[in-house]
Amino acid sequence: MNNPEIVMIGLGYIGLPTAALIASNSVYVHGVDINQNVVETINQGKVHIVEPELDYAVANAVKEGYLKASGTPVEASTYIIVVPTPFKAKNEPDISYVEAATRGLLQLFKAGDLYIIESTSPVGTTEKMMSLIYRERPELKDKLHIAYCPERVLPGNVMYELVHNDRVIGGVNEASTQKAIAFYQKYIKGILHPTNARTAEMCKLVENSSRDVQIAFANELSLICDKAGIDVWELITLANKHPRVQILQPGCGVGGHCIAVDPYFIVSDFPMESKIIGAAREINNYKSFWCVEKIENAKLQFEILHKRKPKTAIMGLAFKPNIDDLRESPAKYIAQKILQNAQNEVHFIVEPNIKSHNFFKLTDTQTAIEQADIIVFLVAHDEFKNIQLSDDTIVLDFCGILK
């Protein structure tokens, strides 16, 4: 491999597709990940995550010599940080991975380089990293281009949306913004909207917080309708006939490493000003707990009626349909709670998008449907649609797949 132009720190659900996209444009990309299995898998031209078209893109980029993975960074002209930003105690954001990745680049930076953070981050993170860099490398002050550019892609359609979605790009100064725009223009067909780093950071958080609030309204409706004896799916369909109403669909909660996480970045920093955002998080978290209660009640009623414990099928573990991503998944939380509460019961856990799991013993769809007394739909995977159910099977549909 020739000297790389791009170093991509983090080869997960966003970093690897981004690296593959850039490499597909005949640009040498050096990907970095702390997981040696990930590194070895990629260098074999294979992928460790499920994402349509990604396997072909990676295989081709590796074969052509434009993509290589490693455990350590090397010198380049552009560095992109796409690492996790998890929580500390009390839902406080943890930017230690971003800081560690940045520290790993300190001795590689040179004047004129471009440093970009794509990781979802609290407001002010880019400025903190700039201060860190200049404190350790004062001779580079005002000689690096530093920017924040959040991804805004949908799992399951990442390879398309990376290219075609608009992006918000915010530099620590105008020169950094323009440098970052010039970089992304080579690979992205969507409109690139310039701003400053703080606004770009908040923009990503607000986008996902807005979705969380809207989903919370739908989930709250589902709780109300359950108590009122109303079909929430029919209600929402009818309400959406109004030309200025567009209610989202309820589910068993909210998951993923964006919508279920990003609101806390705002609530943590602005607790007094983010009442609606905080309340939405509470509602969506409660919906998962409510689903557990409904399942446990259905199992109890079955046992009272039939004098035996039911066999229960839990359909879906991913945080959204047709992907293998279980991060922050309410379905996974519900399945774990059901198993923890179980005593001498049979459960069929079905997740067609993963081969195995270190906690759950997985079952195929057909076996679960044929043997279960109670079927719980948590995720609307395509594989679950048009399933023929027995008339005497008890069905709990928390994702609207039967509507």
Each model region followed by its residue ranges:
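Structural/interface elements that position substrates and couple domains in central-metabolism enzymes
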Residues: 1-403
